[in-house]
Amino acid sequence: MVYKDIDRTTEDFRRILCCAKHFAKQGKLVVMPPKLDVPYKNSAYDVIYGSLKGTAYYGKCPDLMVDNVWYEHEGYNSENPKTNFSNMCKRGLRQSDRIIVEDCGLTDGYLKRNILIRQNEGQQIKELWVKKGNILRLIYKAE
């Protein structure tokens, strides 16, 4: 389900829609909610994002919900792959502990090691997916 208030003209919309289609093809229920400018002042926030209440992400607007679990997609704009990945994780983890990042050319081994280092530093990461073109790959899932 895509909310009618979403700006469908952005490149970000197309990337997130690609992610949504990936999960929907697996038979999962996918919701693409709108971004709300000032969530805590918007009465629709609790209706749409109410499941975030009581979490560190309450007041945030993650990009999509898959089977009642929130995911955040992040892209990049630098030429340095390691900087790109670091920035995507940093921004994504502000919205959700399940993130989808654009492929920046790093190996799966590097990505997994980086996630383990972040977890040892106390960051909560439940899933990491990499999107390359129209394909999503699960790199890490917490047990």
Give the location of each predicted region:
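A short, glycine/Asx- and small/polar-enriched loop/turn
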Residues: 57-60, 67
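Conserved catalytic cores of phosphodiester-cleaving nucleases, focusing on short active-site segments
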Residues: 64-75
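Metal-dependent nuclease catalytic core centered on acidic motifs
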Residues: 1-49, 55-58, 76-143
